[in-house]
Amino acid sequence: MSFVDVKGVRTFYHEYGNAKDEDVIFIHGLGSSSIVWRDIPDALSRHFHTIAVDLVGFGLSEKPKESDYYTIEGFSKFIIDFLETIGSIKEETSKISLIGHSLGGYIAAQVATQLKEKVKRLVLVDSSGLLESPTPLLNDYYAAAMEVNPIMRYEKIKRVLEDMYASPSRLLPIAVDLFNYIIEKQGARHAFELTFKNSTTTQIKLEGFKAIQDVQCLVLWGEKDNLIPIRYYDMFRQKLPKAKYEVIPDAGHAPFIEKTALFYEKLSTFLSQNNNKK
């Protein structure tokens, strides 16, 4: 666990494995943090140099007031600046893999369009980027996060997170506690509000899809995702026909939590194809 200064933004990240191995970068979703990936980055570190970062405005990273940070373009710039700061893309021959969940998938795809010579693999997990408007559960999520009464917010967040799972009984109380702990930090609600407004009504442009057609891509989706339903998985199929597609059965919006072993198997198999040292 480390902090690094990314162009003036104090940024938190987890790092595992040997820096000589290929870099695999994990990008979380809206209102989340690097801890959401749990043991997966560590497990992959036997063969990869894995890094899970807290986006600007989220987790333990700094939460600046400037609104430009909280657009897809702003987050993409932040990730590129982060990669440059930690040295992931400094070498001319450097190749990385990007793994993004939900909002993180949208950001990862955007980064891939800008760094297509550097991005070897792209993994989109229950990704946003094709929403025309917020889904009903996304609106509930926003309302819960914006609730100022801590007791009411706890109950609202608990209900929303339960609805994100295929089986609500799998939700650990600590996940609700962690969300409430982070959202109460100075600037966190501001970051959430701006990010929600800037990411749930915009889409990956056609040129963006064209730019990443030849990037090795895996799209993973929870079969019972209520936040970004599986119809968006079908829409990605049309936009990225060369990608590999996998549905995780009996999983909701975060299949890496509900079906960790199966998710890890799919992910590690994909990443292990043509794996090389730096």
Write out the residue ranges for each language-model feature.
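Conserved HGGG/HGGXW glycine-rich cap/lid loop of the alpha/beta-hydrolase fold
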Residues: 9-12, 16-62
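Gly/Ala-rich beta-loop-alpha elbow adjacent to hydrolase catalytic centers
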Residues: 100, 104, 108
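Short beta-strand/loop motif that positions the catalytic acidic residue
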Residues: 212, 219-221
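Catalytic active-site module of serine/aspartate enzymes centered on a nucleophile-bearing elbow/loop
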Residues: 243-278
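Flexible "cap/lid" loop of the alpha/beta hydrolase fold
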Residues: 109-113, 121-152
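Acidic catalytic loop of the alpha/beta-hydrolase fold
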Residues: 224-228
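Active-site loop/oxyanion-hole signature of alpha/beta-hydrolase fold enzymes
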Residues: 6-9, 14, 55-99, 265
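Conserved alpha/beta-hydrolase catalytic His-Asp/Glu region
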Residues: 11, 152-211
